[in-house]
From Swiss-Prot:
Coiled-coil region(s): none
GO terms, molecular function: ion channel regulator activity; toxin activity
Span of the signal peptide: 1-28
Listed GO CC annotations: extracellular region
Disulfide bonds: C32-C51, C40-C56, C44-C58
Protein origin, superkingdom: Eukaryota
Record's function text: Weakly inhibits the Kv1.3/KCNA3 channel (1 uM of thetoxin inhibits currents by 13.2%) and Kv7.1/KCNQ1 channel (10 uM of the toxin inhibits currents by 27.7%).
Family: Belongs to the short scorpion toxin superfamily. Potassium channel inhibitor family. Alpha-KTx 29 subfamily.
Tissue: Expressed by the venom gland.
Main subcellular localisation: secreted
Location within or outside the cell: Secreted
Annotated keywords: Disulfide bond, Ion channel impairing toxin, Neurotoxin, Secreted, Signal, Toxin
Record's protein name: Potassium channel toxin alpha-KTx 29.3
Length: 60
């Protein structure tokens, strides 16, 4: 049972790291909160040009 918990923790950590790196590659600024970045990515279909608190601009 402990090994299952360990695998789940590793998966959560890897998923979090991947999502953070994905947000940085779609143009989300460092000062853009994760919640705001998620909204921008959904709104712009992952084509985010500018992401700041309260500001979300899509590219193309």
């Amino acid at each position: 049972m402990k090994s299952v918990c360990g695998v789940l923790i590793i998966l959560v950590v890897l998923t979090t790291m991947l999502s953070i790196s994905t947000f940085s590659t779609v143009g989300a600024e460092a000062d853009c909160p994760i919640s705001e970045a998620i909204k921008c990515v959904e709104k712009c279909n992952q084509k985010v040009e500018v992401c700041e608190p309260g500001v979300c601009k899509c590219s193309g």
